[in-house]
């Protein structure tokens, strides 16, 4: 998820992620005033003029326990969590190697 000013970095991350993983990946670049786009720490970067992205599993839209007392480890899908993490590691490696001179 990104604001419009960060959409280039969002496209780059999505391309690197999908090249590194078979895990499904969706992206959304939208104006900052769009509901749910700015609901996390990345929006603090936007407010200071920095690009920022949010990687999410859709949080409360997926897990009814999100930010509740019942939000415990047994409500998480660690297999998918690991797949996303592996995809992100691959994506960061691709992006880092592309940035090297």
Language-model features: locations:
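Active-site-adjacent substrate-binding region
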Residues: 1-101
């Amino acid at each position: 998820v990104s604001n419009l000013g960060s959409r280039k970095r969002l496209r780059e991350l999505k391309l690197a992620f999908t090249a590194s993983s078979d895990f499904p990946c969706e992206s959304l670049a939208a104006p900052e005033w769009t509901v749910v786009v700015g609901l996390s720490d990345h929006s603090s970067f936007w407010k200071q003029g920095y690009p920022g992205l949010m990687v999410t599993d859709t949080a409360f839209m997926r897990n009814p326990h999100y930010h509740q007392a019942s939000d415990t480890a047994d409500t998480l899908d660690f297999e998918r969590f690991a797949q996303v993490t592996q995809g992100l590691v691959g994506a960061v490696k691709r992006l880092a190697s592309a940035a090297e001179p």
